[in-house]
Design a protein with these regions (language model features):
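Low-complexity, intrinsically disordered short peptide segments enriched in small/polar/basic residues
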Residues: 19-20, 36, 57, 76
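Compositionally biased, intrinsically disordered low-complexity segments
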Residues: 25, 46-49, 82
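A generic structural signal for ordered secondary structure
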Residues: 29, 43, 71-74
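Short aromatic-glycine-(Arg/Gly/Cys) micro-motifs in beta-strand/loop hairpins
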Residues: 40-65
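A short, charged, amphipathic alpha-helix used as a generic interaction element across diverse proteins
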Residues: 61-84
Length: 84
């Protein structure tokens, strides 16, 4: 993915995520944070031969790697997984 690719809005969610802010980062990556600014993690849209799905992931401590929480068919589910 080109790092200069324009960020895209997260596909329409079933309900507005109460108490969360979803910020487009680049291309198909969004940061999910609480309204106080604490970053919960990221949602990334991944497309393969089965179609698009949404991967929830968290940054591990100060490391530069992510812990994948799960992959979901709907963006709402990927965002919800980061709440817990």
């Amino acid at each position: 993915m080109d790092l200069l690719e324009r960020p895209a809005p997260l596909p329409l969610l079933r309900a507005a995520p109460r108490g969360l802010e979803i910020v487009p980062r680049r291309g198909a990556l969004w940061r999910v944070a609480r309204t106080d600014g604490y970053v919960l993690g990221y949602v990334e849209r991944v497309t393969d031969e089965t179609g698009p799905h949404y991967r929830s992931k968290r940054l591990i401590g100060r490391a530069e790697r992510f812990d994948v929480i799960g992959e979901f068919g709907a963006p709402d589910d990927a965002v919800d997984a980061l709440r817990y």
